[in-house]
């Protein structure tokens, strides 16, 4: 298993319940594939460095996990088709 750091920015106009559901959905992708979430930090609403999709703010979430490469690929695929997401990044830590 590899160590990953995942950062994603949710749209600021999502309700708390909707953002919580998305975070649980993304975490479940890792845990369903025998991965482990080691850390999950919700940074809250912050101003973006530049405008993304007509938004100037977003809810930042940082997740550290241990997972197989296939789980990271699936997470990336789901990120790309999720409407409530502004931006995402998956980094493999060495």
Curated annotation (Swiss-Prot):
GO terms for cellular component: cytoplasm; ribonucleoprotein complex; ribosome. The keyword Ribonucleoprotein applies. The keyword RNA-binding applies. GO terms for biological process: translation. It comes from the Bacteria. One of its GO terms (molecular function) is small ribosomal subunit rRNA binding. Keywords: Ribonucleoprotein, Ribosomal protein, RNA-binding, rRNA-binding. Belongs to the bacterial ribosomal protein bS6 family. Binds together with bS18 to 16S ribosomal RNA. This is Small ribosomal subunit protein bS6. The gene is rpsF.
